[in-house]
C-alpha cells in the first residue's frame, strides 16, 4: 500500500508541473548528478512518459526514498520553490530498514527548509557555472573545428580549400635534443662521431607531453624543430583539429590556443587576455575562468623563428600579469620563460636557425624533430593529392624513377610543388624528366608556368613586376624580413593590382588575420627570387633605387653576397647562393629568358668560379660543413664542365654524409673531380623503430632529412638510414676508376655492408683504379665480402694498405682473405684486422701468409681472442727467414706467459721485426723474463716494445734493466699501467743514466712516487735531456 501511496503522491506533484517545467524536469532526470547516489533515467523512456509513468519509472530505477529525493532536488533546480517546500513538508516517513540518502543539502531534517533552500540554490549555482564553462568549452571546440578543418589549397581558385584530414599525411617525429655543435649545420659531422651508437627514438603526437618514464615529471614544453617546408605549421594545425575533434589531449587540456608568432610581433601592445580573446569565437569569452586553471591550457606557438627582432638577451622586464598590455615579443617571451601562467604548457615550432636563441629561454623542454615523409607516406601523399587513382599511380611511378626528385619529396612543400608540376604537365602532355632534377629546376618550372606573359605590353609589364618581386625578396632577405606592408610593395614598384594578380598566381599569400600584410608563399620562394635579383638585367643599368621611392636597394654586386655567405652560414643566405648557382645553368638561363621574356646575366658564372678558387686556396672550405655545402651549390648548377673546373681546386675531400641526397650530390661532384688525391667519406645513420617496421614490410628505405641549409635545417645532421644502396655505391665509386690522382679512400664508420663492399671491389679491380690506401673500419662487413676482397688483393698491385678493423669477418672470412694475400700479385704492405672476431683457428692461415708474402710488413690483429696457442702458430712462421714482418700488433689478445717463449724465439731469429705491441695481455713477470731472453739476443733488432697493462711488478725490473743496458736497438719501452713500485723505478733510473743505455722514450704509470723516486726521475731528465719520460694515466 505504501508503495502505491508514494507513487500517487509523486505523480500528483508532477501533475502540477506545466508542460515547459515537465520538460525541464525530464531533462534533469537524464542529467542527474551521479555523485548524489541516484541513477539517471534514460531519455528514451522519459521522453513520452506522462506524470504517472514518470513517477513509476523514478521509483522503479531508484526506489521510493531516492525517487522522492530526486524530485525535491529537481524542483529546486527548475526554480519551483512552492513544490520544493511542499514536498519537504509532505515527505513520507521512511522505515529504518531503508537506506538513507546521504545528502544533507537535500533531506537533512535538522536544518530548516529555508536554510536547505538557500544551500541548494548555492550548490545549483555552482553546478550552473560549471555547466556554462563546459558549454563554452564545447562552443570553443566547435569554433576550432570549423577554423582548422580546412586548409587553403595553393592551386585552388579563390576561396577554395581542402579538408585538412583528407590531405594530411603523417610526418615522422623523433625525440631529439642535440647540442649546438651537432646543430651547426645539417651536414656537419665532426671527426668520427658515432651517431649510430645512439639510435633516434620516434614519438607519437599523443605522447608529446607524457613523461619519459614512470619516475619522470610530465613534460610542459615541447619544441617542434624542422626545416622550411617540412610541415611544422600543418602539424600544428592538425593538433588543433584533433583536439577539437575529441581525439587528442582530452584528459590533459581544456583549451588549446593557436598563436601565430609573426602576427603577434606585428601588434604594438596587447595583454595575454587580449591574445586569448583573439583566438575565441565571440568578443566576451570567460577569460578569467579560462586562466584560473593554467595547467589545463596549451599555447601552440607557431613560427618562433619568424619573430622580427624579438627575444634579445636584454629584452627588459617580463610580464607576470595576464591583464597587462605588453609588446608582442615581451608577451611571448614571458610565456616561454614561464613568468606568465607558468603552469601552462607550450608547444613551439621553429626552424633550427632560431633554436639556439630559443633554447636559452626554456627550462627542460622536450625537443621533437620533424623528419618529413617516409617513402610510404610520400606515396600516400601522392594518392591523396591526385583525385584520379590512375594519375596518382603514374605520377608516383615517374617520381620513383628519379631518385633525386623522389628524395626531395620527403619535404612536404617540395612534394606539393612536384605534384603540382606533374599535374600541370599531365594536363598539357609534357614530360618532367629534365625539369625536376634539382630544387632550382623544380622551382624554375613551377614559377615559369605561372608567370607566362601573353605577349605585347604584358611582356614589359611582367618584367617590371618580376624585377619588383626580386628586389622585394632580396631586400627582405638582407633585412631578415618576411612580412611586407603595402608601402613596401609600392617602394619596389608593385601596385595593388599587381599583388592581386600574384595572389591569383599564388606567388603571394594575403595574411588572413593581418590585413595589408603580404608574404611570399614560403621562405624558399623568397630566397629563389632573391637569387634572381642578382641575375636579372634591368632596362636601366645601375639602378639602386626605385623611381619615386627613397628606398636604397641591396647591392647587386654578387661578391658582396658571397663574402657574407660565410658569415651567415646559419642564416638565410645559404639557400640564396644555392639558387644562384642553379640559376646560372646555361640551359636554365635560356629557358627562363624564353619563358619570361627577360634578359639574364651570365657574367656571374666567372665570379662564382673565382670565389671558389679564392676560398679553396685560403683553405676556408676544407673544414666541414662548407665542403659538402659547396657540393650542393655545384650540384644545383648541373654543369659538368663548370663542376670539373671548380673541383680541381680540391685535391683532398673530407665529408660526412647523412642523407641519400648527400650521397647523390657528393657522387655527382666526386665523379667530376679529376685531381682528387685523398677521399675520406663518413656516413651517419640512425633508424627509428617505425622505419625498421617499414623495412620489414619490404619497403625501400630512403635516407631522408633536410637538404636545406641554415634556416632550413642547420641542426639536422643525425638522420635515418638503412644500408647504402648498390646504385649509390656504383655512382660514388665510379670515380675510383676515372680519377688518376685519387690514391686514398677512407670509408670508416659507415654502413657500407657486404653489398656495398662487393660494388667497391668491382671498382678496385679496374685497371685504372689507383687506390693505394683503403680504410674500411666499422663498415658492417662480414665473411661474405672476404672473397671479393681476396680477388682485389690478387689482382690490384697498387693497393698497399688495408684496414678492416671492427668488422665481424670471423675465422672463415680470414681464410678467404688469405688466399688473396698469398697471391704472387698481392703487394699489400699493411693490414689491420683489429677486433674482427678472430680466434686461434685463423692463425694457421695467417701464419701461411707470413711465410709466403714478400710484401706484408705490418700486421695488426689485436682485440681478438687468439690466445697463446694461436700466437705460437704465428711465431712458428714468423721465424722463417723469408718473413718480412716489421711490425706486429697483438694488443688484448688473451696472452699469458705461456706464449713468451715463442715470441722470444721470433725476436732472436727475425731481424726484420722492429715493433712489437703486447699491451693488455697478462704476461706477468715470468713472461717478461722469457721475453728478455730473445730481446738480449745479438740478432734482435726490436726498436719499440709496448708492455702497458701486462700485470708487471718490480720483480721484472731487473730483467728489463739488463735489457736496457745491453740492447743496441731498443729505443722505446712503454710500461704504463703496471705496478712497478718505487723500487723498480729507482732501478730504472740508475740504468738509464749509463751511457750504454740508448733508450729514448720510456712510458711509466702516473702514480704516487715517494720523494726519493720523484727526485731521481727529475735528476735523470736533467742529466739526460735526450730521454723522454711519459707518465701515462692509470686505468
Swiss-Prot record:
Segments forming a coiled coil = none
Where in this protein does the record say Phosphotyrosine is found?
A: 13, 136, 140, 143, 168, 860
The record's listing under InterPro entries reads: DAPIN, DEATH-like_dom_sf, Leu-rich_rpt, LRR_dom_sf, NACHT-assoc, NACHT_NTPase, NLRP_HD2, NLRP_innate_immun_reg
Q: Which Gene3D superfamilies match?
A: Death Domain, Fas, P-loop containing nucleotide triphosphate hydrolases, Ribonuclease Inhibitor
Q: Describe the location of the FISNA domain by residue ranges.
A: 140-210
Major site of localization recorded for this protein: cytoplasm
Which keywords annotate this record? Answer: Activator, Amyloidosis, ATP-binding, Cytoplasm, Cytoskeleton, Disulfide bond, Endoplasmic reticulum, Golgi apparatus, Hydrolase, Immunity, Inflammasome, Inflammatory response, Innate immunity, Isopeptide bond, Leucine-rich repeat, Lipoprotein, Membrane, Mitochondrion, Nucleotide-binding, Nucleus, Palmitate, Phosphoprotein, Repeat, Secreted, Transcription, Transcription regulation, Ubl conjugation
Covalent crosslink: Glycyl lysine isopeptide (Lys-Gly) (interchain with G-Cter in ubiquitin): 324, 430, 689, 877, 926, 972
A Pfam family reported for this protein in Swiss-Prot or TrEMBL: NLRC4_HD2
What does the subunit section of this Swiss-Prot or TrEMBL entry state?
Sensor component of NLRP3 inflammasomes; inflammasomes are supramolecular complexes that assemble in the cytosol in response to pathogens and other damage-associated signals and play critical roles in innate immunity and inflammation. The core of NLRP3 inflammasomes consists of a signal sensor component (NLRP3), an adapter (PYCARD/ASC), which recruits an effector pro-inflammatory caspase (CASP1 and, possibly, CASP4 and CASP5). Homodecamer; inactive NLRP3 forms homodecameric double-ring cages that hide pyrin domains within NACHT-LRR rings to avoid premature activation.
Q: Hey, which family's this protein in?
A: Belongs to the NLRP family.
The name this protein goes by in its record = NACHT, LRR and PYD domains-containing protein 3
Which species is listed as the source?
Answer: Macaca mulatta
Amino acid at each position: 500500500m505504501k508503495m502505491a501511496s508514494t507513487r500517487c503522491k509523486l505523480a500528483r506533484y508532477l501533475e502540477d508541473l506545466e508542460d515547459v517545467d515537465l520538460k525541464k524536469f525530464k531533462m534533469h532526470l537524464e542529467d542527474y548528478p551521479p555523485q548524489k547516489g541516484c541513477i539517471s533515467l534514460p531519455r528514451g523512456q522519459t521522453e513520452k512518459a506522462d506524470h504517472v509513468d514518470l513517477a513509476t519509472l523514478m521509483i522503479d530505477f531508484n526506489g521510493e526514498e531516492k525517487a522522492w529525493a530526486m524530485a525535491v532536488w529537481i524542483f529546486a533546480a527548475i526554480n519551483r520553490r512552492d513544490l520544493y517546500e511542499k514536498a519537504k513538508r509532505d515527505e513520507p516517513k521512511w522505515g529504518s530498514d531503508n537506506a538513507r540518502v546521504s545528502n544533507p543539502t537535500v533531506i537533512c531534517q535538522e536544518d530548516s527548509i529555508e536554510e536547505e533552500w538557500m544551500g541548494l540554490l548555492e550548490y545549483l549555482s555552482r553546478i550552473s557555472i560549471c555547466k556554462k564553462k563546459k558549454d563554452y568549452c564545447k562552443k570553443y571546440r566547435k569554433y576550432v573545428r570549423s577554423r582548422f578543418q580546412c586548409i587553403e589549397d595553393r592551386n585552388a581558385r579563390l576561396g577554395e580549400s581542402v579538408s585538412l584530414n583528407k590531405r594530411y599525411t603523417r610526418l615522422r617525429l623523433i625525440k631529439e635534443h642535440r647540442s649546438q655543435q651537432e646543430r651547426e649545420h645539417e651536414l656537419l659531422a665532426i671527426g668520427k662521431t658515432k651517431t649510430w651508437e645512439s639510435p633516434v627514438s620516434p614519438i607519437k603526437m599523443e605522447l608529446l607531453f607524457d613523461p619519459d618514464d614512470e619516475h619522470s615529471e610530465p613534460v610542459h614544453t615541447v619544441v617542434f624543430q624542422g626545416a622550411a617546408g617540412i610541415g611544422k605549421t600543418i602539424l600544428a594545425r592538425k593538433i588543433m583539429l584533433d583536439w577539437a575533434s575529441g581525439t587528442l589531449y582530452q584528459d590533459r587540456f581544456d583549451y588549446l590556443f593557436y598563436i601565430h608568432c609573426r602576427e603577434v610581433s606585428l601588434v604594438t601592445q596587447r595583454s595575454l587576455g587580449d591574445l586569448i580573446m583573439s583566438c575565441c569565437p565571440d568578443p566576451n569569452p570567460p577569460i578569467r575562468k579560462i586562466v584560473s586553471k593554467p595547467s589545463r591550457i596549451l599555447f601552440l606557438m607557431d613560427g618562433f623563428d619568424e619573430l622580427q627582432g624579438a627575444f634579445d638577451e636584454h629584452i627588459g622586464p617580463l610580464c607576470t600579469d595576464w591583464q597587462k598590455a605588453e609588446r608582442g615579443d615581451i608577451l611571448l617571451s614571458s610565456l616561454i620563460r614561464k613568468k606568465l601562467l607558468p603552469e601552462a604548457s607550450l608547444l613551439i615550432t621553429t626552424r633550427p636557425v632560431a633554436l639556439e636563441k630559443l633554447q636559452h629561454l626554456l627550462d627542460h623542454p622536450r625537443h621533437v624533430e620533424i623528419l618529413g615523409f617516409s617513402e610510404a607516406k610520400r606515396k600516400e601523399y601522392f594518392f591523396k593529392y591526385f583525385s584520379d587513382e590512375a594519375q596518382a599511380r603514374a605520377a608516383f611511378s615517374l617520381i620513383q624513377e628519379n631518385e633525386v626528385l623522389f628524395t626531395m619529396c620527403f619535404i612536404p612543400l617540395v612534394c606539393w610543388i612536384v605534384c603540382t608540376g606533374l599535374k600541370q604537365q599531365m594536363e598539357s602532355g609534357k614530360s618532367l624528366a629534365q625539369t625536376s632534377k634539382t630544387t632550382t629546376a623544380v622551382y624554375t618550372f613551377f614559377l615559369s608556368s605561372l608567370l607566362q606573359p601573353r605577349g605585347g605590353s604584358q611582356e614589359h609589364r611582367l618584367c617590371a613586376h618580376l624585377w619588383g618581386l626580386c628586389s622585394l625578396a632580396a631586400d627582405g632577405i638582407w633585412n631578415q624580413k618576411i612580412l611586407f606592408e603595402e608601402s613596401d610593395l609600392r617602394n619596389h614598384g608593385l601596385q595593388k593590382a599587381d599583388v592581386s594578380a600574384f595572389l591569383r598566381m599564388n606567388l603571394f599569400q594575403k595574411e588572413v588575420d593581418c590585413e595589408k600584410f603580404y608574404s611570399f608563399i614560403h621562405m624558399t620562394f623568397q630566397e629563389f627570387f632573391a637569387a634572381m635579383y642578382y641575375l636579372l638585367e634591368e632596362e636601366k643599368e645601375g639602378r639602386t633605387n626605385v623611381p619615386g621611392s627613397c628606398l636604397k636597394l641591396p647591392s647587386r654586386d654578387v661578391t658582396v653576397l658571397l663574402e657574407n655567405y660565410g658569415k651567415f652560414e646559419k642564416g638565410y643566405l645559404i639557400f640564396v647562393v644555392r639558387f644562384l648557382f642553379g640559376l646560372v645553368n646555361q640551359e636554365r638561363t635560356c629557358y627562363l629568358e624564353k619563358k619570361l621574356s627577360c634578359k639574364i646575366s651570365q657574367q656571374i658564372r666567372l665570379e662564382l668560379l673565382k670565389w671558389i678558387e679564392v676560398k679553396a686556396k685560403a683553405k676556408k672550405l676544407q673544414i666541414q660543413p662548407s665542403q659538402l655545402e659547396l657540393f650542393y651549390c655545384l650540384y644545383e648548377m648541373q654543369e659538368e664542365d663548370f663542376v670539373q673546373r671548380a673541383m680541381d681546386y680540391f685535391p683532398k675531400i673530407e665529408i660526412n654524409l647523412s642523407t641519400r641526397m648527400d650521397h647523390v650530390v657528393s657522387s655527382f661532384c666526386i665523379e667530376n673531380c679529376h685531381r682528387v688525391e685523398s677521399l675520406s667519406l663518413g656516413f651517419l645513420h640512425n633508424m627509428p623503430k617505425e622505419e625498421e617496421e617499414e623495412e620489414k614490410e619490404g619497403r625501400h628505405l630512403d635516407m631522408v632529412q633536410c637538404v636545406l641549409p641554415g634556416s632550413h635545417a642547420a641542426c639536422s645532421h643525425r638522420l635515418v638510414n638503412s644500408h647504402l644502396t648498390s646504385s649509390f655505391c656504383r655512382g660514388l665509386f665510379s670515380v675510383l676508376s676515372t680519377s688518376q690522382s685519387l690514391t686514398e679512400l677512407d670509408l670508416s664508420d659507415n654502413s657500407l655492408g657486404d653489398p656495398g663492399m662487393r660494388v667497391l671491389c668491382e671498382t678496385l679491380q679496374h685497371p685504372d683504379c689507383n687506390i693505394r690506401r683503403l680504410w674500411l673500419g666499422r663498415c658492417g662487413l662480414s665473411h661474405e665480402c672476404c672473397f671479393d676482397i681476396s680477388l682485389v688483393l690478387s689482382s690490384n698491385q697498387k693497393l698497399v694498405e688495408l684496414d678492416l678493423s671492427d668488422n665481424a669477418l670471423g675465422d672463415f672470412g680470414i681464410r678467404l682473405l688469405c688466399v688473396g694475400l698469398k697471391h704472387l700479385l698481392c703487394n699489400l704492405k699493411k693490414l689491420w684486422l683489429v677486433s674482427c672476431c678472430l680466434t686461434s683457428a685463423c692463425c694457421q692461415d695467417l701464419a701461411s701468409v707470413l711465410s709466403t708474402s714478400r710484401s706484408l710488413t705490418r700486421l695488426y690483429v689485436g682485440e681478438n681472442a687468439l690466445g697463446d696457442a694461436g700466437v705460437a702458430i704465428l711465431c712458428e712462421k714468423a721465424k722463417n727467414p723469408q718473413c718480412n714482418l716489421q711490425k706486429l700488433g697483438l694488443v688484448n689478445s688473451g696472452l699469458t706467459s705461456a706464449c713468451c717463449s715463442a715470441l722470444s724465439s721470433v725476436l732472436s731469429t727475425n731481424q726484420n721485426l722492429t715493433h712489437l705491441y703486447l699491451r693488455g695481455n697478462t704476461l706477468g713477470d715470468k713472461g717478461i723474463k722469457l721475453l728478455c731472453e730473445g730481446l738480449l739476443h745479438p740478432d734482435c733488432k726490436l726498436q719499440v716494445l709496448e708492455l702497458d697493462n701486462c700485470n708487471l711488478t718490480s720483480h721484472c725490473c731487473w730483467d728489463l734493466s739488463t735489457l736496457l743496458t745491453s740492447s743496441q736497438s731498443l729505443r722505446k719501452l712503454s710500461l704504463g699501467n703496471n705496478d712497478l713500485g718505487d723500487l723498480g723505478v729507482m732501478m730504472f733510473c740508475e740504468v738509464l743514466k749509463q751511457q750504454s743505455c740508448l733508450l729514448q722514450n720510456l712510458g711509466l704509470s702516473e702514480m704516487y712516487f715517494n720523494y726519493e723516486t720523484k727526485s731521481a726521475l727529475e735528476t735523470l731528465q736533467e742529466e739526460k735531456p735526450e730521454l723522454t719520460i711519459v707518465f701515462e694515466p692509470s686505468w
